[in-house]
Amino acid sequence: LHLSIRRQRQMCIRDRDTALSFILIIGSITALFMGFLGIIQNDIKRVVAYSTLSQLGYMTVALGASAYSVAVFHLMTHAFFKALLFLAAGSVIIGMHHDQDIRNMGGLRKYMPITWITSLLGSLALIGTPLFSGFYSKDSIIEAVHATHLFGSGFANFAVLAGVFVTAFYSFRMYFLVFHGEERFGKEHAHHDDHAHAKAAHADHGHDDHAHDAHDDHGHDEHHGLAPGQKPHESPWVVTLPLVLLAIPSVLIGFFAIQPMLHGDFFNGVITVNESHGAMAELKEHFHGAVAMAIHGLSTAPFWLALAGVVTAYYCYMINPRVPAWFYKHFHALHTLLENKYYMDKFNEVFIAGGARLLGGGLSKVGDKTLIDGLIVNGSAKVVAWFSRVIRVFQSGYIYHYAFVMILGMLGLLSYFVIFPLFAK
């Protein structure tokens, strides 16, 4: 991202709309489809990690829309609330005795109040709640995409809006399963059986329909977790104090930084945008202050999509867990696709790594063994050996053999001095 922004001058000078469209489309695909992967994760750290990939997609979208300062702005705000969420996930893992599976949690709010409230603030910032830092940066990206007219901008606009719903859904899916609902820790869990879990989802309101992967890496050893009767605990102050400190900018930094970073002179002389790409000019024209933007945000599609994502997550995992079980049953193929990360790992293993191994094997067989060892190394030795055998015939000790060699040498010299000048003319 940083290198792309550093190269924005070349993109502007040469007016590479094709390159910008490519960046816009790649970013929007990343923002949406990495968010889908976050929905099915059960490892608390993986949910936050795929969220990070999705948000990097939003930043890339901003680059494609020539809103470079917005990309940096979202990078900055995202650094605070994502660091908060990662540290909160670590706090939960500590409190759960290194269990990272959100299906084994639930009801942690009363045991870990500081982690609970800071996680809520970080999640609200992530989904773009008005007045929170993520709102100002993410909404600016969405508006910049709406203002651009590059090829692929229609798809990008759809993807970033759909991504708002997806982000809210997986963020609060994790939040509700970890901090609310029935306490599921300190019990024996059988997450390895798909059908057993699908049945359990009908009876247990806290369980998740996606917890049925025999090969899912839950991120913890089978001996980790709370023993029966053991309760979670809040993390020590060396963890909770940074949580509180990170929560403050996660809420406030966007409010105070949007004016200088996007509409002030913060990037003067550093970022130059081609006049034909007017996304930033349109953002500046419609900006009337951070408070006005937050109030206006309550009536925009991103806010209602985020709210819909939160409500949907609450309904599916707190009120009626039969809904996720139904989706798993009827859309098992889709779940398998997401579970296997769109088979990109398999693609990389077969085509990228396999192709590299095939190329390396070919170079080893043809280049190294045949050309280098066979022709140059061993071949040169064989030529010297053959030449030695030929020369050895004339080194017999008989004078007529030496005389014959001298005659051949003289004929060679005469041929050189007589024939070569003819060709030289």
What are these regions (language model features)?
Residues 19-29, 76-80, 158-166, 248, ...:
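Hydrophobic alpha-helical transmembrane segments of multi-pass membrane proteins
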Residues 1-9, 13:
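Single conserved hydrophobic/aromatic residue that forms the stacking wall/gate
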Residues 82, 86, 157-228, 305-309, ...:
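Predominantly late transmembrane helices and immediately cytosolic-facing juxtamembrane segments
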Residues 7, 18-67, 121:
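Internal transmembrane alpha-helices of multipass membrane proteins
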Residues 49-54, 59, 96-132, 155-163, ...:
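Interfacial and helix-entry/exit segments of alpha-helical transmembrane bundles
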Residues 59-63, 139-157:
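Interfacial segments of multi-pass membrane proteins
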Residues 233, 237, 248, 259-304, ...:
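Aromatic-capped, Gly/Pro-kinked transmembrane alpha-helices
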Residues 43, 53, 78, 105, ...:
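Divalent metal-coordination and catalytic microenvironments
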